[in-house]
Each structure stands twice: as structure tokens, then as C-alpha cells.
């Protein structure tokens, strides 16, 4: 890894993202002093970290890496208490104040009931939470975490990130961590460093980094689509007999009936009502069209990634006759129509979709209501 030149102010979270093997762990280990640097300097509060004594550095910097810790004959409380040893004397004897801090830290990570349990017998996720308690006990200025959410379920992933944000907000702690979950990185980070190959590819705020085209390039994403609105990825539709398709397939992508890629189902949706149907049809490999969807509708964002064609309308405009006619033509070529809207969800702006539903019923098409 070369040409890394970044600075991070106190009380901020920097997240490293990038493909596997890109160098995220190498950067964290270099900052922590666990890898000898070929060149360059790491400064902490204006001081070269190599000039700071080990015990003082342990008070100011806490590190949790991905390797599993397998200590012998240590309870969860013992592991958390390890964070207090930079503050003890040569014999490492904990004071009552130290023990109080250990109990508080275990309570924060919801592991106080496991204080006396053998660390090796608790689950990987619970071990990760105990290691976070150790970090809290250590009271550092800088926390380094390598994939801290790897072994956690979604509830405890969120809990861990909330704890980190609280430490940042209340104690002005600085956090540098690596994450694979882009949707979490987008929400928790103040700054993001993108690492790929030998270089730090880009550095900036989440708003600057999490762009559809850039994330696709960073991860060489050719088997799915990244949505900057949702902050998540969608699985690319299998090519199969229907061939390849790129996102943003508006009405111009619709083919004539009977040709490969022709939608078999027309979905009338809006306001998020079509999401589960879009994903179900994609899982089943059924090509479908969606419309009429306003370009600021959340269903439009998903449909443009999963549907074979989308009939759009401008944001905040009533569905016009041109969009209605295009949708009607495509719908008539489909053997099946799914309407995801309740009767009361039709209004002035999307009255064209009510007309589409009536035309489908009048024409005797196979109409299914999903509400």
C-alpha cells in the first residue's frame, strides 16, 4: 500500500472499504505498529507513534483485529479487564475503580450476565462484544477495529456501531475501522477511505463516496447493482435465455412481443408497494415491466435495476398521456398483470395507473391484486 496521506480530526469515524485483499488490514496494522512500515510516519496528536512508549501508547490507542483470541482460563470479565492494565502498576493488580469500569463496560455491551463465563465458551459474536468492552475499559483516544461486525447478528451490529458513535460524540474518541457492509459504512462514517490494490483509491465523505458508478468500479461489480439511494446491492438477473440487461432500462428497452427479453408480467406499483413483487419475479427468473412510476418514487429506483423495462414519468407530474399509452401497449403484450396498489392509494398524480388497471380488467387479462 502506497501514497496514503490523510488526516483525521478528533471525534470522527473513518471507515475503510474495498474488495477483499485490497489492503484494509495492512493499513490498520501499520497504524497500530504491528507491521513495520517501508516508509512514512503515523502521527497521533502531533507525535510520531514510534516515539511514544508502549504503555503510554496502550493508553491512547486500542486495537481489535480479525484474528480470534483463544486465551486459556480467562473469563469474559478477565478479558474486558485487560483494557485496564495500561493503568495498573507492575503487578497488574486492579483497583476497585478498575473493577467498576469493567462492570460498566460489560453492561454497555450487554454482556454483564456472562462476566464469569469462560471466554472460550461464549459465541463468536459474544466474544466480539467482550473485546469491545475491553476497548471501552482502555479509554483510548484512538480505536482501531478490523471488521468488528463480522461475527455479529444484525441487532448486535447496530448496537456496536451505536456504541462507537456514542463514544465519538460523548468522549471525542477517534475511530478507524474496516467494514464490508456498505449500508452500515454509509450510515456510521464521517469519512471513508477506499482501498484497492496498492493504492488508496479515494477519500471523502459518505456523500462523496457512495455513488452508483464509483462503487461498481471499486468492487468490479459485474454480477449485481449498487443503489446509492438504498445503500445496498441487488442481485443481477440471471442472463439465461433472456440475455444481459443493464440498469436504468426505461421503456425504450422493451422489445416486441415474443422476442427474448419481452416482459411476461406488468406490475402496477408505487410508493414502495412493488418492492417484494419485483424481487420475487427476479428470483423466479420472470421478465417483467413496471409502470407508470415517477422518477422520484422509491419503486422506480428498484425497478430500474430489476425490471426488463420501466415506464417512467417526471417527478411531481400527473401521469401524462404519452407515458400512459406506452404502458398500455406494453401491458397488453403481457399475459399477466400484478397491481400492488390498494384502491385508496390511487389519486390525482397516479390516476393513469388506475386507468391501466381498469383497461387490464376490461381486456380480460390475468389480473392479480397484491395489497
What annotation goes with each model-predicted range?
Residues 32:
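Helix-to-loop junction immediately C-terminal to a conserved catalytic motif
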Residues 40-48, 57:
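Conserved ABC transporter NBD signature motif
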Residues 48, 193, 197-208:
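Conserved switch/coupling elements of ABC/ABC-like ATPase nucleotide-binding domains
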Residues 81, 96-114:
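Conserved ABC ATPase "signature" region
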Residues 139:
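Conserved catalytic motifs of ABC-family nucleotide-binding domains
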Residues 143-147:
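Catalytic Walker B motif of ABC-type/P-loop ATPase nucleotide-binding domains
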Residues 220-318, 339, 347, 366-371:
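ABC ATPase nucleotide-binding domains
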Amino acid at each position: 500500500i502506497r501514497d496514503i496521506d490523510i488526516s483525521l480530526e478528533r471525534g470522527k469515524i473513518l471507515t475503510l472499504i474495498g474488495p477483499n485483499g485490497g489492503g484494509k488490514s495492512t493499513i490498520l496494522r501499520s497504524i497500530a505498529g504491528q507491521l513495520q512500515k517501508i516508509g512514512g510516519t503515523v502521527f497521533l496528536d502531533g507525535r510520531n507513534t514510534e516515539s511514544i512508549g508502549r504503555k503510554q501508547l496502550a493508553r491512547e490507542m486500542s486495537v481489535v483485529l480479525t484474528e480470534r483470541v483463544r486465551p486459556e482460563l480467562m473469563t469474559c470479565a478477565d478479558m474486558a479487564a485487560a483494557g485496564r492494565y495500561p493503568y495498573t502498576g507492575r503487578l497488574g493488580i486492579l483497583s476497585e475503580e478498575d473493577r467498576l469500569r469493567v462492570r460498566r463496560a460489560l453492561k454497555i455491551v450487554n454482556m454483564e450476565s456472562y462476566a464469569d463465563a469462560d471466554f472460550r465458551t461464549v459465541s463468536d459474536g459474544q466474544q466480539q462484544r467482550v473485546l469491545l468492552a475491553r476497548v471501552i475499559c482502555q479509554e483510548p483516544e484512538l480505536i482501531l477495529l478490523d471488521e468488528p461486525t463480522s461475527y455479529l447478528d444484525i441487532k448486535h451490529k447496530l448496537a456496536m456501531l451505536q456504541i462507537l458513535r456514542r463514544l465519538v460524540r460523548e468522549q471525542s474518541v477517534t475511530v478507524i475501522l474496516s467494514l464490508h457492509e456498505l449500508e452500515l459504512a454509509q450510515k456510521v462514517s464521517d469519512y471513508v477511505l477506499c482501498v484497492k490494490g496498492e493504492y488508496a483509491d479515494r477519500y471523502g465523505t459518505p456523500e462523496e463516496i457512495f455513488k452508483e458508478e464509483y462503487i461498481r468500479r471499486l468492487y468490479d461489480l459485474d454480477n449485481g447493482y449498487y443503489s446509492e439511494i438504498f445503500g445496498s446491492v441487488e442481485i443481477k438477473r440471471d442472463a439465461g435465455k433472456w440475455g444481459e440487461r443493464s440498469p436504468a432500462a426505461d421503456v425504450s428497452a422493451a422489445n416486441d412481443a415474443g422476442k427474448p427479453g419481452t416482459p411476461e408480467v406488468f406490475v402496477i406499483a408505487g410508493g414502495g408497494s412493488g418492492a417484494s413483487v419485483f424481487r420475487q419475479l427476479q428470483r423466479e427468473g420472470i421478465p417483467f415491466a413496471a409502470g407508470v412510476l415517477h422518477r422520484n418514487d422509491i419503486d422506480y429506483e428498484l425497478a430500474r435495476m430489476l425490471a426488463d423495462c420501466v415506464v417512467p414519468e417526471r417527478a411531481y407530474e400527473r401521469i401524462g398521456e404519452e407515458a400512459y399509452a406506452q404502458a398500455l401497449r406494453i401491458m397488453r403484450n403481457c399475459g399477466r398483470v400484478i397491481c400492488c396498489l390498494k384502491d385508496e392509494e390511487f389519486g390525482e398524480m397516479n390516476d393513469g395507473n388506475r386507468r391501466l388497471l381498469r383497461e387490464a380488467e376490461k381486456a380480460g387479462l390475468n389480473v392479480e391484486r397484491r395489497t
